Structures are given as C-alpha cells and as structure tokens.
C-alpha cells in the first residue's frame, strides 16, 4: 500500500525548492545527539511559509537529542473521511524526498491495545496534518544517517478519554515490541478571525497577535505542566479553536508514562507575521517533552 502526497506543491514546495527551504530552516542545526531524552513533540501543520520555521524547531531539538526508531504521528482529521480514530496500517508514504515506511507491527499493536482505533487508510488519503511533518523528519534522518518508520494516526474525535487511551496504547505497544518511539502531535493553536467564524475578542491589528498568543499560552502552560485535564478544561472554557488537542493529550499521557520531567516551548508565532491579515490569524507552537 502506497500513500502519495496530497498537498505537495500547496502546503510545501516540491523538488529542489523544498530542499532549499529545509536547509534555510535548519541552518542553525547543531551536532547530532544520542541522549534520547525527548519523548514527544508538538509541531504545527500550516503552509511552510507560515509555520515551517516553528515546526523545524521541534525537529532540530530531536536531531540534537537523538532520533528514535519510530515516530507515532497524531494529526486531526480535517477531511471527515474514514474512521474517527484511524491508524494507517502498512506500506509506504511518499513525499518529494522519497518513501517513508510504516511500522505496521507497531500500528497493529496500538490498535489492539487501544480498543478504540481502527486500521484505516481512507482517513489519511487527503489529510495534510501528518504529511507536512514528514519532510522535516526525512531531512534530519538523512543528516543523521539513520532510518526511521512512522505510525500515522488521524483523530476525528478528540477528548481526554481518547488521549488517555491512545497515549497509553502507544506506551504499552512500544514496551511490548521493544520500540524506541517519539510521539509527534501535529496541531495549530487558535484559529481567530471572521474567516473561521471565531472572534472572541477584538483589538487593533497590531494588538491582535499578542491577544491570540495570550489565549494560546493558557493552553500551552497546561501542556508544559503535563496537565491533560487542565488543557481540555481551558479549551472548553474558552471554546478554543486549537485543532489537534487529542494528539497533544496523547503525547502528554505517553510522556508521563515514560517518566518525562520537563517540557519546553521552543518557538511561538502567528500567521499574522507573514500574512498581515486580521481576518484569519492562527497560532503556531513548537514544544518538546523530555524525560
């Protein structure tokens, strides 16, 4: 089974332009590490011109800490297709940088242990939130001279129970199979403005990005504290438009079980820095969790 790119040439460029963009994002890449303390990372999934640099901070940290055998990548299901909790079963994902192998053994074990997920490829066919993460991983893996596999999981249902079940299933599956795993939660934060039908506050154009950040930081602080319940409470209280809380929650649960002790916000920005539009402002954050 092969999954071909759905958004190459749209969310990110193809060919040499993609390589040049990645090289620019990673121009400050440090030495390859081998401490393997990172358990999970959070990265955005907008077009690279908006959020690519922020996403690169997560993968820079992973490169400098050491790459795992497998990345379990959670992304929200924007298309509504397929199973509400869909684990891609087997085969390869293709990007302009080449093929990425699915860790099918781990995928099946996660489905078995979670009791709520399905093996399903349809949910992934046109979804961009996981696809856009792969060129970053391919780039750092090539630099490191290492192979890796992935388990892509899309979420159409996102709540505490789903996060708890999936985070625990990833941990138990990795333990059972002896896998070294990092969880990646693909998410953007607040989607503000008339374009999204979400205007919980108003202000001058130059004030709005900071106001978006203030609201996002209420959630980010909960993430940095590994506070799953508190994160979802903040989201409900604000009716917040973060699109991937379920994956972030799974990363929190997995990291707790891996005895993670610290989390760090590496970078934050908004789409306003590029677009200068107040009709649609989206927050982006890079976060890593470490044991």
From Swiss-Prot:
It holds the Pfam family Memo. SUPFAM superfamilies: LigB-like (SSF53213). InterPro entries: MEMO1_fam. It comes from the Archaea. Belongs to the MEMO1 family. NCBIfam families: AmmeMemoSam_B, PRK00782.1. This is MEMO1 family protein PYRAB05390.
């Amino acid at each position: 089974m092969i999954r071909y790119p759905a958004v190459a040439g749209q969310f990110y460029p193809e060919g040499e332009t993609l390589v040049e963009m990645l090289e620019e994002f990673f121009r400050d890449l440090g030495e390859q590490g081998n401490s393997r303390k990172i358990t999970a990372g959070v990265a955005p999934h907008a077009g690279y011109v908006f959020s690519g640099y922020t996403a690169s901070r997560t993968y820079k940290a992973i490169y400098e800490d050491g790459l795992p055998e497998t990345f379990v990548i959670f992304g929200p299901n924007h298309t509504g297709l397929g199973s509400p909790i869909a684990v891609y079963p087997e085969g390869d994902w293709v990007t302009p940088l080449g093929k990425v192998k699915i860790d099918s053994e781990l995928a099946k074990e996660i489905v078995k242990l979670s009791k709520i997920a399905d093996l399903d490829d349809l949910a992934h066919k046109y979804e961009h939130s996981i696809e856009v993460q792969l060129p970053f991983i391919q780039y750092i893996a090539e630099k490191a001279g290492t192979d890796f596999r992935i388990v892509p999981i899309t979420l159409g249902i996102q709540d505490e129970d789903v996060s708890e079940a999936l985070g625990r299933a990833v941990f138990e599956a990795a333990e059972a199979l002896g896998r070294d795993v990092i969880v990646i939660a693909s998410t953007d934060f607040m989607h503000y403005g008339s374009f999204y039908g979400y205007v919980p506050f108003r202000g001058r154009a130059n004030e709005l990005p900071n106001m978006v950040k203030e609201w996002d930081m209420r959630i980010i602080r909960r993430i940095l504290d590994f506070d799953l319940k508190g994160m979802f409470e903040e989201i409900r209280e604000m009716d917040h438009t973060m699109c991937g809380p379920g994956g972030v929650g799974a990363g929190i649960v997995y990291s707790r079980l891996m005895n993670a002790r610290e989390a760090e916000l590496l970078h934050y920005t908004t789409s306003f820095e590029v677009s200068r539009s107040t009709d649609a402002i989206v927050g982006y954050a890079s976060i890593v969790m470490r044991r």
